[in-house]
Amino acid sequence: MSIKSDKWIRRMAAEYGMIEPFEPGQVKQKDGHSIVSYGTSSYGYDIRCSDEFKLFTNLNSTIVDPKRFDSNSFVDLKNDICIIPPNSFALARTVEYFRIPRNVLTICLGKSTYARCGIIVNVTPFEPEWEGYVTLEFSNTTPLPAKIYANEGVAQVIFFEADEVCETSYKDRKGKYQFQQGVTLPKI
């Protein structure tokens, strides 16, 4: 299994539609202002979050149960920024839509710009033949409110090409998060 380079990422985006919209270079400025970078890096792709957020709230004072998750635990927000309360979290989705080839698995890691501020980005692997917008999880580990910027970089996707094609892909298993379009809550 090998990590794939910028050349491979560009080729797969062009020929396979692996990432849409796709940025072949690194974008570090917008309208003359510095932003958290996004686009193709040496051995990965820096993804952006859209302006669609689900902000966790404890207004209903419920127990967080992944098997019976209460959607009323979130407040929907559409904005250029999302302020996450102390020790809380928010969900968002990527700007980019992904189509993962059958012989590829990805790992996604948060950008250091956010990590150095106590904001942790968690994303599970994109499995072979998974397709959709990625749901992003942001945890504010600080005792202060934390800001997330829409349409800027939040995490890096690293692509691994397998030595052998898997017998059963995410698509074959009819994975429950296949073709997700928006911010997707837990499913069982």
Swiss-Prot record:
DCTP binds at residues 111-116, 135-137, 156, 170, 180. The keyword Nucleotide-binding applies. GO terms for biological process: dUMP biosynthetic process; dUTP biosynthetic process; nucleobase-containing small molecule interconversion. Gene3D superfamilies: 2.70.40.10. The keyword Hydrolase applies. Its EC number is 3.5.4.13. Pathway: Pyrimidine metabolism; dUMP biosynthesis; dUMP from dCTP (dUTP route): step 1/2. Pfam families: DCD. GO terms for molecular function: dCTP deaminase activity; nucleotide binding. It catalyses: dCTP + H2O + H(+) = dUTP + NH4(+). Disulfide bonds: none annotated. InterPro entries: dCTP_deaminase, dUTPase-like_sf, dUTPase_trimeric. The active site is at residue 137. Keywords: Hydrolase, Nucleotide metabolism, Nucleotide-binding. NCBIfam families: dCTP_deam (TIGR02274). Catalyzes the deamination of dCTP to dUTP. HAMAP family: dCTP_deaminase. Belongs to the dCTP deaminase family. Homotrimer. This is dCTP deaminase. It comes from Nitrosomonas eutropha (strain DSM 101675 / C91 / Nm57). The gene is dcd.
